[in-house]
């Protein structure tokens, strides 16, 4: 996402530092909604006359990981500023505060809720009657829940009453499966979350060919995140939430294009088993295999609230549109790339649970590959290229833990992966990419390693716009790109004949002509045949976060722009034919498209600084 300054730290030979500040402003909707709650100023004003009750007491009795809860309010002294917060764990008073949260005078509260609604939600008569019934949707987050009624609004909160405690029947259950490619083409990883430490239960995945026996059991590794591994507030303070245990298992030696079934399990110390849901996935085709292959790409989605909790209505208003459209279209694609700004937790750590629950129908069925964005990584003095606070103190730790990706070093969020006729080079725009850096060397090696006879479709992706965008603040800066974005990389895109480069960060959709050094090198708009001559750059940051304005002047390289939420679908029919489609999330219809038709000799053709050395010697 675009908020936070574009304050960029880089080093020259003399270790000279320069900060670049963008022209755009941080808007109110850029802030995490929970940041509006002045936690430390909370005072106590318990009233015996106020009643707040939650039902049912036990959730998920049939194994569900999501449940609806009814909260009834009776308040003899209601006001417009009353609001109801959801807390988990249920005990949220000062006894749970860490030393780092302590101020000169210890506050009563030191943690933010998971979400909230105003007490008059959907009932205009609350201010007169003091009675209302609120419905909340909860997910299993490994702890019990309570509901708190506050008066005084978000800035001067007064805690008035706390409800009874409710809980899921098994808070520790294995949940929220998410698939990703391993480092080998015939390897799939399964990552999930549970409340079981390795001291009390052994995690594994049971899997095999769908409908066949015997089944294989593969062990899982387990990672945890501690509060002191966060780099700053709010992740390290009021936004902290225990994420339990993250398990990852590697399913190896898969047959290509084959359907498998799987389920996560834990063996308890008494020998009994706890099982997760049953899922299926289709393994990847062999690199270069000629078959129908379909890819989804987008960025900047975030999370939504299906119960109408109003704090997310302006921050990530399109998140559920995109999620629901992808769930609906699930049989018609094979892999997803979410290229940065994943959950927009921004240091309110419980959002990571809620995001993995939101995308679970997708991520449990097809590989869900992620990239790093500013809202995952950026934090001052933490090694990020940009010296801003957009990650809310997470400094990359949570994204690196919650999702698997086949990088050599998870703290350096760049990697390559294959899917049949596609070769993907995923860059990390939150680390230095310029010539001479470690990442630049990776990018060149990744692009150079593509066997274009077998894998003709070469795709580059990064979160920030390292190519072209006519977004309003880039236009104000006069760059139409992230500062220094394409300066080093465009010669690599041209040399290795990258077909399409994708970016997020800017919350809209835009497609360029095939371009090199700011000049269109092909006059086509809807169909390209033979030698394309340049890379097509696509901004696809309309995954769900609030939208970004375009500049009013349209550059000559901008073919199509759309101020809406959406995603891109690539379909490779064979090694000679590729279909590109941009779909709106609201209806799933195609609003922009083009095709590429070519042969292997067209990829080899000498054009614009992509010519191999030759000799006249016989």
Could you tell me what each predicted segment is?
Residues 53-58, 68-72, 120-122, 131-136, ...:
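Eukaryotic intrinsically disordered and solvent-exposed regulatory patches
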Residues 564:
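Substrate-binding and catalytic surfaces of secreted/luminal carbohydrate-active proteins
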Residues 169-539, 543-550, 559-561, 569-617:
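Metal-dependent phosphoester/phosphodiester hydrolase catalytic core
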């Amino acid at each position: 996402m675009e908020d936070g300054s574009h304050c960029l730290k880089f080093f020259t030979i003399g270790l000279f530092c320069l900060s670049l500040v963008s022209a755009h402003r941080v808007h109110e909707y850029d802030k995490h909604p929970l940041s509006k709650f002045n936690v430390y100023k909370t005072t106590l004003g318990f009233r015996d006359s106020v009643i707040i009750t939650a039902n049912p007491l036990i959730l998920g009795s049939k194994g569900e990981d999501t449940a609806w809860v009814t909260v009834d309010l009776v308040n003899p002294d209601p006001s417009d500023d009353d609001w109801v917060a959801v807390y988990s764990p249920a005990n949220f008073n000062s006894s749970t505060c860490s030393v780092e949260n302590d101020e000169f005078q210890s506050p009563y509260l030191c943690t933010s809720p998971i979400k909230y609604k105003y007490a008059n939600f959907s009932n205009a008569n609350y201010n007169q009657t003091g009675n209302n019934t609120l419905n909340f949707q909860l997910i299993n987050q490994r702890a019990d829940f309570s509901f708190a009624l506050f008066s005084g609004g978000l800035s001067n909160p007064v805690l008035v009453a706390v409800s009874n405690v409710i809980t899921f029947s098994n808070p520790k259950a294995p949940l929220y499966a998410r698939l990703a490619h391993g480092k080998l083409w015939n390897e799939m990883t399964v990552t999930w979350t549970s409340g079981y430490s390795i001291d009390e239960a052994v995690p594994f995945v049971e899997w095999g060919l769908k409908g066949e026996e015997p089944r294989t059991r593969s062990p899982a590794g387990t990672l945890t995140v501690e509060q002191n591994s966060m780099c700053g507030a709010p992740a390290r303070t009021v936004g902290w939430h225990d994420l339990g245990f993250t398990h990852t298992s590697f399913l190896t030696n898969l047959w290509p294009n084959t359907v498998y079934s799987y389920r996560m399990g834990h063996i308890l110390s008494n020998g009994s088993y706890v099982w997760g849901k049953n899922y299926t996935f289709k393994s990847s085709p062999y690199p270069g295999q000629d078959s129908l292959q379909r890819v989804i790409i987008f960025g900047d989605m975030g999370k939504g609230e299906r119960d109408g909790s109003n704090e997310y209505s302006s921050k990530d208003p399109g998140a559920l549109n995109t999620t629901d459209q992808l769930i609906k279209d699930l049989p018609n694609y094979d892999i997803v790339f979410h290229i940065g700004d994943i959950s927009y937790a921004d240091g309110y750590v419980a959002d990571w649970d809620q995001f993995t629950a939101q995308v679970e129908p997708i991520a449990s069925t097809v590989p869900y590959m992620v990239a790093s964005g500013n809202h995952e990584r950026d934090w001052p003095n933490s090694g990020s290229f940009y010296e801003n606070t957009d990650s809310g103190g997470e400094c990359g730790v949570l994204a690196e833990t919650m999702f698997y990706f086949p990088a050599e070093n998870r703290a350096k969020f760049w990697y390559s992966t294959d899917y049949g006729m596609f070769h993907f080079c995923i860059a990390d725009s939150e680390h230095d990419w310029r010539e001479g850096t470690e990442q630049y060397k990776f990018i060149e090696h990744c692009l150079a390693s593509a066997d274009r006879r077998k894998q003709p479709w070469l795709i580059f992706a990064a979160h920030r716009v390292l190519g072209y965008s006519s977004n309003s603040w880039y236009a104000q800066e006069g760059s139409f790109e992230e500062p220094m974005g394409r300066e080093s990389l465009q010669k690599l895109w041209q040399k290795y004949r990258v077909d399409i480069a994708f970016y997020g960060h800017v919350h809209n959709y835009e497609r360029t002509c095939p371009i090199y050094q700011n000049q269109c090198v092909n006059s086509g708009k809807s169909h390209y045949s033979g030698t394309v001559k340049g890379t097509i750059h696509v901004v696809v940051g309309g995954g769900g976060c609030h939208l970004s304005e375009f500049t009013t002047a349209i550059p000559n390289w901008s073919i199509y722009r759309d101020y809406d939420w959406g995603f891109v679908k690539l379909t490779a029919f064979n090694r000679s034919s590729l279909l590109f489609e941009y779909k709106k999330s609201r209806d799933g219809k195609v609003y922009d498209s083009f095709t590429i038709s070519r042969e292997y000799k067209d990829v080899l053709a000498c054009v614009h600084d992509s010519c191999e050395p030759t000799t006249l010697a016989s």
